[in-house]
Structures are given as structure tokens and as C-alpha cells.
């Protein structure tokens, strides 16, 4: 394993060429890195430098759900931490979009079978970022979290008329934690 091996072999030779944008679908091998958001932001900046475009559209595919029946609370999951790090990197970096794939995961396979819906979501982000279609639907992302009495209220950007589950009903539960996992 060579950390820069793939970059040097596959991406570096393309530096200087013109590209319309980039899609990043992270592998699962370095799931436990707590500094992932900083690393991802550095990667985006490096690619933009290499391709000579400070506004290069960059789409990040968020890790899907995996192993539905888990002993861990969602906020304790390494995958939940990674998804949040992906969200933070996109939130803190201009000209980026997050493609949510949480609902496309499989309980028994790390790679989701439903590639069509994922591709449509990535394409919508590309339409929005790279081609200026401001009506293209983007993935919902949490915007604000606050307490109202005994309830916790979460507002989302890009949620249209609201969030729905696969069966068309409203979601009943969310797992929420602070940056310390509490």
C-alpha cells in the first residue's frame, strides 16, 4: 500500500488538462481516520491546483449504510463519523456538493447494488455545480439542529417538501450527537 501510489500513477499524469468536474467516491479502507474532513479538503484543493481551476466542481459521494443490524448506536459507528466528516468537508469548501447514499446501502454488502439511483443523484449534483442548473435536485443535508423543549429539531437544506422514507412515510427517528459523539 502506497498512499500516493494511485495519485501518482493515475491522476498526476492528467494535471494541466481541462476537466469539467470531479466525483469522489471514498473507499472504506481508512474508515477510522478522525481527520478525514481536513484530508478531503486538502485533496480537493490539490486537484483544483493540478487542473488550474480554483472553482473546479467537486462532488463527494457519502458512504452508504452498511450492516443494518448492528450492536452500535448510529452515532458510535465509524461509518457515521466518516459520513459526518464528508459532510463537514463539503460544507466548508466552496463549489462542492454531497451526494447522499445513506438509504442505498445493503445489510450484507459493503457495495450498494442500486447504482442507478446513486448515478442519478451524482448527475443532479453535476447538473447543479458544473452546468448551472439551479433547479437540479440536490441531496438533503442537515442545516441546523436545536432543542425545542424536550424535542430536538433538525432542519435540512435541499429537502423540498420534507424528508420521506423508502415507503413514502415521514421518518420517525434520527440519531444525533455532538462533535464528541454525545
Give each language-model segment a name.
Residues 1-182:
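Cell-envelope and extracellular/periplasmic
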